[in-house]
Amino acid sequence: MALLRDVSLQDPRDRFELLQRVGAGTYGDVYKARDTVTSELAAVKIVKLDPGDDISSLQQEITILRECRHPNVVAYIGSYLRNDRLWICMEFCGGGSLQEIYHATGPLEERQIAYVCREALKGLHHLHSQGKIHRDIKGANLLLTLQGDVKLADFGVSGELTASVAKRRSFIGTPYWMAPEVAAVERKGGYNELCDVWALGITAIELGELQPPLFHLHPMRALMLMSKSSFQPPKLRDKTRWTQNFHHFLKLALTKNPKKRPTAEKLLQHPFTTQQLPRALLTQLLDKASDPHLGTPSPEDCELETYDMFPDTIHSRGQHGPAERTPSEIQFHQVKFGAPRRKETDPLNEPWEEEWTLLGKEELSGSLLQSVQEALEERSLTIRSASEFQELDSPDDTMGTIKRAPFLGPLPTDPPAEEPLSSPPGTLPPPPSGPNSSPLLPTAWATMKQREDPERSSCHGLPPTPKVHMGACFSKVFNGCPLRIHAAVTWIHPVTRDQFLVVGAEEGIYTLNLHELHEDTLEKLISHRCSWLYCVNNVLLSLSGKSTHIWAHDLPGLFEQRRLQQQVPLSIPTNRLTQRIIPRRFALSTKIPDTKGCLQCRVVRNPYTGATFLLAALPTSLLLLQWYEPLQKFLLLKNFSSPLPSPAGMLEPLVLDGKELPQVCVGAEGPEGPGCRVLFHVLPLEAGLTPDILIPPEGIPGSAQQVIQVDRDTILVSFERCVRIVNMQGEPTATLAPELTFDFPIETVVCLQDSVLAFWSHGMQGRSLDTNEVTQEITDETRIFRVLGAHRDIILESIPTDNPEAHSNLYILTGHQSTY
């Protein structure tokens, strides 16, 4: 490891006392510390260095901080290298970042934005006069002191302009704030300090609208749009809310041609920044941020249909009255099942939260430095070589910065006009070959991180048993449920490790702690009608509201909010609390844009690339969104304006080797007979949709009811009374039984480890995947059964046959050791 210049080798612990962790910078964690020499507070970034690490970026940050002394740039105190840990010590800004502040207060007022722009421009003017570029201006990198000063921070990706290198040629920054010439650097040949002016203009919009333009798009799609010659600079959405001075200031700062874009010095002379702007504007903002009751309500919540009158808690009838066992419940304990089979196209396990708590929530002592070192070793916080793509994994900067990436892979492009819109019915398109079959999106941008998760068997909930053949059975978890349930999933809390059943119903979203079945209580989580649920990385997706948008809910946050509400009784109804005091961008439930009127959706993972997609079928279009790990959310990747042949019909994503995007199966058919081929009707998303694809009418003989991709080359196709097992071309498989036959009309099929479980209105039957022999069977003419969920765990509902309006019983297939 090369030696760093201007770095002391003395022990930094002799001067600085660490107090608490406050965030993460570009390459390391940041701590609040006390300077024992001056008794003042300081910010200390600690980075673990390993042999062979590229330290050029760290050296750049130290050099820029040391050389740039200005009131609007965080002051540099010193750097220390001790035991392979680099300490960069800077001025502490107690007000936090502007991103943190607007999350608490909502949008800034125009004069507050003007004040921030003026102070930031002063810092940029000084930086540019020294021949340096910041390259990562955004709300998260503008810090405030408690006195209302604005400081430029985080110079981890900054660059220096020299006489020999008049323009930077590296692709660096944060996508949504990136200037067009930076997005197209490989084609246009470079950029200069004016990219910071563009980023400040985007930041001004961010402060007024709580997010930068194009934020609903996947970052790579946003970059692709910005690099096009037809790209138009963004504007404020609400023209009437803001003054003409603000609009004109943004027009200048966001001038597309950098040769015509004004400098920071020139913009300091604009009327928007020369108006009377006292420091009190920012101190008032800080006061507001410290008082959450001054937050603004979320207008999105007004669109949700709520059930205020339905109880917050529902007790199982087993506690408060006799619970008679039905014939099927007796059979449930006699018939054993194999574990549910994990589909290769299911998203990976939820990554458990890293065991790294915010220091300061606990009593601090002399062992803090030891805990810092242990945590650094546990996290393996290292700097990769410059040739590697830097993964966006900072938990505190929710607008991830690209560090250094000489090559990001090809951007998604629009399909050429001459490309065929669909494949002939019957086969999935062949995988591409040749040099043009490179990945659409780099996996570092989009994939969920594969971490070594503890086994789900260690969770607190329904007890697992060893992995034995046929060791599971259905267990009743709730008796007499009054909810009109549409969907259900299971989820494990990342902190308590308790397992929960989450149900989506007409009356809202409720949870049941499977670790506390002696309580037998369903608790309301969200008071909005819900027709579909899916859980990804502790984010609960739901189809909710009067006009059925897709919503994303932060499950750990909602559970914590409910816990606090139960501790401190409020007069405000629990479902209205977020509308009263939590700003829109800080809400625990957020609406995914452009999904109004969604009829159905599916989640699928490409096992070849690791990318996870969300398909949303709307009445007149189909949306394809991709999971973006740094933001823990789905972002729009493509919008197909052509309507599906039947938006409410079959919608099953299929993943093919060599294809980045999933194929959408909208129908399947096949003549009777175990050796017959199944014909798939697929829409290849790379090419777009075709409006006149031939789909067999629903209900006719030979049309499939359900299609399930079990692994990379195996598909289950469910017909009225049989299940075919075929490969991706629709041909019967050679190793498994080509057809499983049933003597009842199939409603739902679920694939177990060695059998297929088919459900019908009065029971279920399992048949071996190898021999077609019956492996399990339960029949109860007195009950009507319905599968509520089959992702990870099978959740079943039953109601009396003679009284369909009666309360239902809920069951979960348990006793197996989950394969997830």
UniProtKB/Swiss-Prot annotation:
Residues 16-273 form the Protein kinase domain. Highly expressed in germinal center but not mantle zone B-cells. Also expressed in lung, brain and placenta and at lower levels in other tissues examined. One of its GO terms (molecular function) is mitogen-activated protein kinase kinase kinase binding. GO terms for cellular component: basolateral plasma membrane; cytoplasm; Golgi membrane. InterPro entries: CNH_dom, Kinase-like_dom_sf, MAPKKKK, Prot_kinase_dom, Protein_kinase_ATP_BS, STE20/SPS1-PAK. The modification Phosphoserine is found at S328, S394. Residues 344-360 are annotated as: PEST2. Its EC number is 2.7.11.1. It is found in: Cytoplasm; Basolateral cell membrane; Golgi apparatus membrane. GO terms for biological process: immune response; innate immune response; intracellular signal transduction; JNK cascade; positive regulation of JNK cascade; positive regulation of JUN kinase activity; protein phosphorylation; vesicle targeting. SUPFAM superfamilies: Protein kinase-like (PK-like) (SSF56112). ATP binds at V22, G23, A24, G25, T26, Y27, G28, D29, V30, K45. Its cofactor is Mg(2+). Gene3D superfamilies: Transferase(Phosphotransferase) domain 1. Residues 405-448 are annotated as: PEST3. The active site is at D136. It is a peripheral membrane protein. It catalyses: L-seryl-[protein] + ATP = O-phospho-L-seryl-[protein] + ADP + H(+); L-threonyl-[protein] + ATP = O-phospho-L-threonyl-[protein] + ADP + H(+). Residues 294-314 are annotated as: PEST1. Keywords: ATP-binding, Cell membrane, Cytoplasm, Golgi apparatus, Immunity, Innate immunity, Kinase, Membrane, Nucleotide-binding, Phosphoprotein, Serine/threonine-protein kinase, Stress response, Transferase, Ubl conjugation. Residues 387-442 are annotated as: Disordered. Serine/threonine-protein kinase which acts as an essential component of the MAP kinase signal transduction pathway. Acts as a MAPK kinase kinase kinase (MAP4K) and is an upstream activator of the stress-activated protein kinase/c-Jun N-terminal kinase (SAP/JNK) signaling pathway and to a lesser extent of the p38 MAPKs signaling pathway. Required for the efficient activation of JNKs by TRAF6-dependent stimuli, including pathogen-associated molecular patterns (PAMPs) such as polyinosine-polycytidine (poly(IC)), lipopolysaccharides (LPS), lipid A, peptidoglycan (PGN), or bacterial flagellin. Belongs to the protein kinase superfamily. STE Ser/Thr protein kinase family. STE20 subfamily. PANTHER family: MITOGEN-ACTIVATED PROTEIN KINASE KINASE KINASE KINASE 2, STERILE20-LIKE KINASE, ISOFORM B-RELATED. Interacts with TRAF2, TRAF6, MAP3K1/MEKK1 and MAP3K11/MLK3. Interacts with RAB8A. This is Mitogen-activated protein kinase kinase kinase kinase 2.
